[in-house]
A protein has these predicted regions:
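N-terminal export signals
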Residues: 5-26
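C-terminal segment of N-terminal export signals and the immediately downstream linker at the start
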Residues: 21-50
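Carbohydrate-recognition beta-sandwich/jelly-roll modules
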Residues: 51-329, 334-335, 350-353, 359, ...
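Active-site-proximal substrate-binding groove within the catalytic cores of carbohydrate-active enzymes
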Residues: 243, 253-259, 264, 436, ...
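The substrate-binding groove and active-site-proximal loops of carbohydrate-active enzymes
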Residues: 299-310, 336-350, 423-440, 468-479
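Acidic/aromatic-lined carbohydrate-recognition and catalytic surfaces
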Residues: 325-404, 489-499
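Active-site groove signature of glycoside hydrolases
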Residues: 331-333, 442-472
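Active-site-adjacent "subsite" loops/lids of carbohydrate-active enzymes
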Residues: 373-448, 536
């Protein structure tokens, strides 16, 4: 078994440039959007209970919370074509199992519209099952239309407040940070009726709707780790997009949700225009100029990667004859005396691994032994310190982690006894990264092999696994903030470490230097239509100045499917990556592996 089939949560059309990516170079600090020279101030006006918004870049009309018109001011392009003000629900409360409760006028409700100031209005909803407020503001500086939805009810169990945009023009393409970047028609089956949680699936808080010469985009400027989600379509209507503001778990007694502001604006050109504006905000919000300066210069030399590399020294010899070792990143999973994914967080190197790592270091290779960030074996003695702080589902409270039996995931035992006595089934429980004692134990246990093996880089698994959970706040931190702190803690062990991790999003990118990334809903086996998921390197644009990505699994080049997977990673901006079992696959490469080596060599 090379890797568990754990990440199956939420598809090559355009050829990637035949250039090995480096850390993304800096781009202009000026936003190349619409000019606001000699324009009127932004305004929000209420007339006959309809809200009219004007900024230097857009004009919009909102009726009962529904955007019935959204136009780019420079071109006059309209992005809403069939808004439904009769049956559609703009504001909703979300409960467990995707149950929605409408906040609107049906069942004897009413809607009020209030002019608050020259640039602000409120739409207040009083419905049978709850009340809500939609605050509408025009930002004079950015030209953004700002929407802040909130809703409350007497019924406990609220997970999120959803605000929907309906009637999107059918020719638009969605560009969004799902699996490193997608650019798909709104009615593409790959994204039909899916809720993408941030940041595990929705890897940054923005979405762009691209037309032939421009588009509009929606984003939130949130640096407080608040959970959110985007809903792409409904079962019956692919041209609806929902934006969720989540409440932290536990939600059993929760009666309300909201607090996030969604910013809407138009742009001319392609999606990289708003993506760059978001990157600039992101850099400032998290002080990433300082993080960028911490990156080691040798990272830019990396142009080739091997994922799940066996520990055969002959592989190093074969590689050295094909490419300079200083250009090669090696992800090394089976280096401990324990079996893979057993007995974490114990990290004791085997004698054969010591030989492999030492030889590789002497030759100049960059070898990343595989550790784990939050998964631990409950049969390990450390469990007694942290057993009260596991991940539990925000909806059903089940323990989260994994067990593996007969080549399939079977979940975590809820029996306290069975949880402790099934190491052979690779039982692992996720521990909240906000827990200081966990970070301390993990760091201490990692530092021993770091010193013994003279490591300067490590790989920590499942860093992408950060989402809203039942016990969401530990030491006042959600898992997102806790993971950020954990990655930084690992990077500061000993003399300092370069950190690689699994997946890439706007939280983990801040201190990771390498990211092993998944293809679209295809961590192991490729889904039907995966070839349509390429051609968009959005996350490379957002995070490429901080992180280099490399491929995940099934990258042998032995058949058409693995060739496609290798190409898709290139299109997302990853360095050429292969997965092999034997040294001969490097010494006598097939056509696809040979191509990856040629690309890596420039």
């Amino acid at each position: 078994m090379k890797r568990r089939n754990f990440i199956k949560t939420a598809g090559i059309s355009a050829a990637a440039a035949l250039v090995t990516p480096g850390l993304e170079p800096g781009t202009s600090d000026s936003y190349s959007g619409n000019s606001k020279d000699q324009i009127s101030p932004a305004s929000v006006k209420v007339k006959d209970n309809i809200v009219y918004i004007e900024t230097f870049s857009l004009s919009a009309v909102i009726d009962k919370g529904i955007v019935i018109s959204l136009k780019d001011k420079a071109s006059g392009e309209e992005f809403i074509e069939k808004p439904d003000t009769t049956n559609f629900r703009a504001l909703q409360l979300l409960y467990r199992n995707n149950e929605l409760s409408n906040i609107n006028e049906e069942k004897f409700g009413n809607t009020e519209v209030h002019q608050i100031s020259e640039r602000r209005a409120e739409i207040v909803f009083h419905s049978w099952d709850g009340d809500g407020v939609l605050t509408i503001t025009a930002d004079d500086q950015t030209g953004d239309l700002m929407i802040e939805p909130s809703a409350s009810t007497s019924r406990p169990g609220v997970l999120a407040c959803r605000w929907n945009i309906t009637g999107l023009r059918q020719s638009l393409e969605l560009v969004a940070p799902f699996f490193q970047g997608i650019k798909l028609k709104l009615n593409d089956p790959l994204i039909k009726n899916i809720r993408w949680g941030w940041p595990f699936q929705w890897e940054a808080g923005l979405a762009m709707f691209q037309s032939e010469k421009g588009g509009f985009w929606v984003h939130t400027q949130d640096n407080k780790y608040r959970f959110k989600a985007i809903q792409t379509g409904t079962q019956d209507d692919p041209f609806t997009i929902g934006f969720d503001s989540e409440a932290y778990g536990p939600i059993d007694d929760n009666l309300s949700a909201g607090g996030l502001c969604w910013r809407i604006n138009t742009y001319r050109g392609d999606w990289k225009v708003p993506a760059e504006r978001y990157r600039q905000w992101y850099w400032q919000a998290y002080n990433l100029d300082a993080e960028e300066k911490l990156r080691q210069k040798w990272i830019n030399d990396i142009s080739f990667a091997i994922s799940w590399c066996p520990g055969d020294p002959a592989i190093l010899d074969a590689l050295s004859k094909k490419i300079s070792p200083k250009k090669v990143l090696i992800h090394f999973p089976n280096w401990r005396t324990d079996n893979y994914d057993e007995n974490y967080p114990t990290f004791i190197p085997s004698e054969s691994a010591k030989t492999f790592i030492k030889k590789g270091q002497q030759m100049g290779f960059h070898i990343m032994p595989h550790f784990n960030s939050i998964d631990m074996d409950p049969s390990n003695p450390v469990y007694s310190y942290v057993r009260d702080f596991p991940y539990r589902s925000v909806e059903n409270k089940q323990l989260q982690g994994w067990s593996w039996y007969n080549r399939r995931v079977i979940g975590v035992p809820e029996s306290n006894t069975n949880r402790l006595n099934n190491q052979d089934k690779k039982v692992m429980v996720k521990i909240h990264p906000g827990l200081s004692i966990w970070r301390s134990i993990l760091g201490q246990n990692m530092l021993k092999p770091v010193n013994e093996l003279s490591l300067d880089l490590v790989f920590i698994d499942v860093t992408l696994c950060i989402w809203n959970i039942h016990n969401c706040l530990v030491e006042s931190m959600p898992p997102t903030e806790g993971m950020n702190k954990l990655i930084k803690h690992v990077s500061e062990l000993g003399p300092g470490l370069v950190v690689g991790g699994e997946g890439l999003n706007e939280i983990t990118a801040q201190r990771q230097s390498f990211a092993q990334v998944h293809l679209f809903r295809s961590s192991q086996d490729s889904i039907e239509g995966i070839e349509r998921s390429g051609g968009c390197n959005l996350n490379q644009v957002l995070f490429g100045r901080l992180v280099k990505t490399f491929g995940y699994s099934n990258l042998s080049g032995r058949n058409k499917d693995t060739e496609t997977r290798m190409q898709l990673h290139l299109e997302h901006g990853a360095v050429p990556t292969v997965t092999i079992s034997l040294a001969d696959e490097i010494a006598n490469p097939n056509a696809s592996v040979k191509r990856m080596l040629e690309l890596a060599n420039g």
